[in-house]
Amino acid sequence: MRNSASSNKNNNKGQNDFAEMEYMNITVVTSNEPYGLFDSSNPFFYKRRTPKFNLTLGGVHSGHVQRGLRDPICISTSGKGNCRDGYTKETSGPDSVRVLVATRAKPSKNLNSELDREFYDHFLEVLNRPEETGRFHFSTQFLYYREELFIAELNNSRLGGKPVVFDMDMSAGDFLSLFYLLKVPVEIIDLKAVIVSPTGWANTATIDVVYDLLHMMGRDDIPVGLGDMFAINQSEPVFPSAGDCKYAKAVPQGCGGFLDSDTLYGLARDLPRSPRRYENSVAHGAPSDTDRPELRQPLALEVWQNLTKSVDEVSKITVLTNGPLTSLAKIISSDKNSSSIIKEVYIVGGHISRGKSDKGNIFTVPSNSYAEFNMFLDPLAAKTVLESGLNITLIPLATQREFSFQAMLNRLYSSTKTPEARFVKRLLTRLQALHQKQRRYMHMDMFLGEILGAIFLGGDHALLKPKMRTEYIKVIAEGDESKDGHILIDKLRGKQIKILERVDLRGCYESFASRLDDKKQSAVIGSFEEQRMKWNTPPSYKPITARIFH
């Protein structure tokens, strides 16, 4: 429509080849009848002498604003919704704006066309033009493109490491932690599975970046399970695919939030691409098929259930969580035997305030001064896990805050012999630069502290010199955003947990950097650029590759 209308310079009414145009006075409905009532749901009018934006009392913006998907005022006795928030409506008066509207699509000029709209025909004709044709798939872009799976062959003589499940929300710090866990010798840590929780700092699709990192490190054999999209009690009971973002909205969209996490701060495409991707199909309830509808992304609970079938009493599972506790809470609630299978839980997160000046890190919710993000993003899950009676070690915000970008980078700069060490150095350098130069990225240092859980789990405690203490705690989860996620000391009714109070920072930096620099269990394919070179070279080996740790 835009291109057609702009071809006529004197066309003031937007006339075009594809739709009939008409000027209308419209508005977007933000409230519902009856209008003019003082409803606490409406921030434009409630407790205001003058309506916001000079809106009209009694106009279409002065009624009840829908609160949630199951707002009782919006549900009729028949069960159907009667609210119109978000509708576009023709109206008049100062609450409306005059715009040019396409009122009807014009029929196809080609009477023999199977399509009944002119813009359908035109759209397909433009897409099929040979000019500027795109190559949208690696198989057409690269002459020798081939999919490979790198499966680690672990000799039985080398097994015996602690079985670990890593529960992450795909923040930058989680990827740093995953690199470290994959570098720890399998005799110490045997990473059995990765669970991703989309209730934290990244969207669901970022699971593909997890697959890419595992592919880079030659561990396509490690299963990845997808957790719930919403925090506990935030999904719609009738339609679980929808829900409330009461807590998730605290994560910024940009500026160190979803956009940066989803792209790993612009570095995600530097990782080699894994054949494993998020897959789903209409047959399994998805709105459309992905490239491989015969496959389906396993859920977190499914991965857990498959894993528990393969472990025995001698090798109970250790869980390391680096994000909201949504997935672990669901496992505890649904698997009654989980307490006998889980040996210990290491939780990176939580804040136990020592005074008014000792505040948390919820910088987007001014009313909540003393919570930490991983607890706040799903407070009910945090309460379920921390008060479950499991053997829990908490690695709180205060301990994480001791980490320094510059000190860590100074140690990494001294030696970067492996692809993974070079990638980690680039990511940390970018986080530090943003932290120093951009006011809206002042929270970048909290991602650095997230690596402490992995270091504490897989590092040499003689080098780390940890200091522990025991506390009895409880978690606030009352539905009040100003209090949810707070962890309080309660010596009478609280649950006992261990708290990592302090570590030797120099030992942590040394443990992290030296492990990444170790050429054992190093990257199988170092970067996407290296992968491109392979795809432009005739193959000389089988499509499925097995790798043995040396």
Curated annotation (Swiss-Prot):
Record flagged with keyword NADP: no
**Any one Pfam family match given in the protein's UniProt record, by short name:** IU_nuc_hydro
Its protein name is Nucleoside hydrolase 4
Which PANTHER family does the record cross-reference, listed alphabetically?
Answer: INOSINE-URIDINE PREFERRING NUCLEOSIDE HYDROLASE FAMILY PROTEIN, NUCLEOSIDE HYDROLASE 3-RELATED
Return the InterPro entries for the record. Inosine/uridine_hydrolase_dom, Ribo_hydro-like
Q: Where in the cell is it found?
A: Cytoplasm
According to its UniProt record, where is this protein mainly located?
A: cytoplasm
Give the enzyme class: hydrolase
Function statement: May be involved in the degradation of nucleosides.
* A GO molecular function held by the record: hydrolase activity, hydrolyzing N-glycosyl compounds
Name the family the entry cites: Belongs to the IUNH family.
Keyword Hydrolase assigned to the entry: answer is yes
Q: Which gene encodes it?
A: NSH4
Give the record's GO CC terms: cytoplasm
What EC numbers are recorded for this enzyme? 3.2.2.-
Keywords in alphabetical order, please.
Answer: Cytoplasm, Hydrolase
